Amino acid sequence: VNGECTLSELTKELHISVPTITKLVQELVDENIVTDLGKVETPGGRRPNIFGLANSAIYFAGVNVGRDNMRFLITDLQNNILKEENDFTFELLDRPQCIERICSGIENFIAACGIDRGKILGLGVCMTGRVNPDTGRSYKYFTSSEQSLRDLLEERVGIRVLLENDTRARCYAEYTCGKSKDESNVLYLHMGRGVAIGIVVDGQLYYGKSGFAGEFGHIPFFDNEIICSCGKKGCLETEVSGIAIEDKMCHLIQKGVNTILKEKYDQQKTIHIDDIITAAKNDDNLSVSYTHLTLPTNRE
């Protein structure tokens, strides 16, 4: 996926003999995965052929399963995004019906793309919480099934699935094709409804001894009695996270503090972090002051 190159360059890069490389590349050309782009200009001597990936040969699908929405995309071999959907309303619950909702969302999105389903090589699924990509299991959701979540999705959708934690997936994306692509070691801080860290060490995702390195939001940090989603008290996430802001804003509205979010709270009986950010942009005093106090600021 490094772009265009000659057989000689492939031989040096992969440490494979010229006859073997020639045979393998020709097989890929015959399968319409690689394209012969013609001769490359050289100062002298025989001009070699240059080869590149055929964008329409293989596709990759991805889905981010969030706590309250899902995001989908389809890319080609050159990482060009062919189609994406970022506003699929969804509530992540530990119920079988939720798996069905995930699967139907994936299938409907792929169908709407209008591409050959058989050309989708893999489906990357990232989600919040503790995830083991080797076993394909989530240790927070859908734990009652004997089958792993990965196997359940593969069986239902019919495409090879890779399951990964959402923060680690974002970290690896930044490392491979983002602002950190030229770095060997990367530390990625995700602050959304939760707080977590993704780590790349010497070009590899770091999982730690437990396999769950990066659960930064669940470090005991505060002397409070707030129970975190992990079951412990005083985690960083109980005070500094989107969830913490939501909970505290709801509490203030219940106490009668003036805010333009009051009507929405009365309708929904809850407030989402996006609602608070929108209200802050509209100069709602409570939202402005509270997000400023809760969210971290740059300190010297």
Each model region followed by its residue ranges:
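Nucleotide/phosphate-binding catalytic cleft detector across ATP-hydrolyzing
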Residues: 1-47
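Conserved phosphate-binding catalytic cores of ATP/NTP-utilizing and phosphoryl-transfer enzymes
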Residues: 36-60, 165-188
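Gly/Thr-rich phosphate-binding beta-strand-loop-beta motif of the actin/hexokinase/Hsp70
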Residues: 47-82, 190, 195-200
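Hydrophobic "anchor" residues
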Residues: 81, 138, 205-206
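Glycine-rich phosphate-binding loop and adjoining helix at the ATP-binding site
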Residues: 84-185
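Glycine-rich phosphate-binding loop of actin/hexokinase-like ATP-binding domains
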Residues: 182-239
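Active-site core segments that coordinate phosphate-bearing ligands/cofactors
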Residues: 218-271
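Conserved small/polar residues in nucleotide/adenosyl-binding loops
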Residues: 291-300
